[in-house]
Design a protein with these regions (language model features):
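Peripheral, non-AAA+ core regions of ATP-driven protein-machinery
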Residues: 2-233
Length: 233
């Protein structure tokens, strides 16, 4: 009997030890679950912060679009690389030039281009700084009538707002009016020849200024909407 009682006591103690181990394991599992939940919350918080940071980075990163304007040097047309850079700002519009002589009304033309771009896209540009750059890599100065590049500038700003790419196969000359009309300019024949030499397939001109030019199709446009449809990819 004493032996049986001892065995029962040993089994009882073993059961108690198992109960203690089970309670300990249960507590460990509970602590582990708590730690996992805490880490999940930390990961979610970090993801949210990274998302905000990524959004801020995208907002601060300038948008740059490249196209071409056309000028005249003597009796020869010249294709001039044009770049528009847009970044977060306060509505400042500025111009950079290299070996390019701009007429005094160029700044006004760019401001009109900005307004027309805003009207066309429906995007408020008052919190964007816009820099328009003309670079002539030739060793001589090229004269560029500011208004005559208005349509090209407008198109490039619109490309920046819509994040689309202007096609170099279609070039344009023409002023831009506040209502979105493309207005008349000079030097059409010289510019058409330069556009063809640059490899363009189509040269867009204001209504009433179409000319015949070897090696390139010359087409008339009236509104900036037509230009966007033909040039932006």
């Amino acid at each position: 009997i004493q032996s049986l009682g001892g065995q029962l006591l040993d089994k009882s103690n073993a059961i108690n030890e198992l109960d203690i181990k089970v309670e300990s394991l249960t507590l460990d599992v509970s602590n582990l679950n708590s730690q996992l939940k805490s880490r999940e919350l930390a990961i979610k918080d970090l993801s949210t912060r990274l998302g905000i940071t990524q959004s801020e980075v995208e907002e601060l990163t300038p948008v740059v679009k490249s196209y071409f304007a056309l000028g005249v040097s003597g009796n020869k047309g010249i294709v001039i690389p044009l770049e528009v850079k847009m970044s977060k700002g306060t509505g400042i519009v500025s111009v950079n030039i290299k070996n390019v002589e701009l007429k005094s009304d160029a700044q006004d033309s760019i401001r009109i281009a900005t307004k027309v771009s805003q009207d066309y896209t429906g995007v408020d540009l008052s919190e964007k700084d816009i820099t328009v750059t003309f670079v002539n890599d030739n060793p001589f100065i090229v004269s560029l009538d500011g208004p005559s590049a208005g349509a090209a500038i407008t198109l490039t700003i619109i490309a920046g707002v819509l994040d689309r790419t202007p096609s170099s196969a279609v070039l344009i000359t023409g002023t831009i009016e506040s209502d979105g009309d493309v207005g008349p300019v000079g030097g059409i024949e010289e510019k058409a020849s330069a556009a063809a030499s640059e490899g363009a397939q189509i040269f867009l001109v204001p209504v009433g200024q179409k000319v015949n030019s070897p090696g390139i199709e010359v087409a008339e446009v009236k509104k900036i909407q037509e230009v966007v449809n033909l040039v932006l990819k």
